[in-house]
Curated annotation (Swiss-Prot):
Protein name per Swiss-Prot or TrEMBL: UPF0713 protein YngL
Entry similarity comment: Belongs to the UPF0713 family.
Organism: Bacillus subtilis (strain 168)
Subcellular compartments: Cell membrane
InterPro entries: Mycophage_PG1_Gp7
Disulfide bonds: none
Length: 130
């Protein structure tokens, strides 16, 4: 690898982001995380019982930690790009598109919520003036 173009670098970042999110958060990969998690009962001051999933091992912590999994996903994506480009590049391309889409979807969702909040504030201000 002599030079890495800016576009390729951005695609590697987006692919790593999406793979990390897929492993740590997405419902579709819950079956991967589940064997490494255990249920823990938590009782609050009022006596309410809640059940929470916590990592059962160091590997469980890695699968549950965005920062930890992110490092390993970046290593996997980077090594795949360098040593198995015929296999890795199509996967990187797909993951990069999905990663960019996820970021855009989040931005749109935040924007829609912000608009709703601003409309509510405007309505409250108009009601106070009346």
């Amino acid at each position: 690898m002599d030079r890495l173009s800016f576009l390729t670098f951005i695609m590697l970042i987006l692919a790593s982001y999406r793979l990390t999110h897929l492993i740590v958060f997405d419902k579709i990969t819950e079956f991967i995380r589940k064997p490494f998690m255990k249920k823990k009962r938590i009782v609050d001051q009022n006596g309410h019982v809640d059940e929470k999933s916590v990592p059962a091992s160091n590997f469980g912590y890695m699968l549950n930690c965005y920062w930890c999994a992110g490092v390993w996903c970046a290593i996997l994506i980077g090594l795949g790009y360098l040593f198995l480009p015929r296999i890795a590049i199509p996967l990187i391309f797909i993951l990069a598109i999905a990663g960019a889409q996820a970021i855009l979807e989040t931005a749109v969702g935040v924007g829609v919520k912000l608009i709703d909040v601003l409309k509510s504030l405007q309505t409250m201000m108009n009601d106070k003036k009346s």
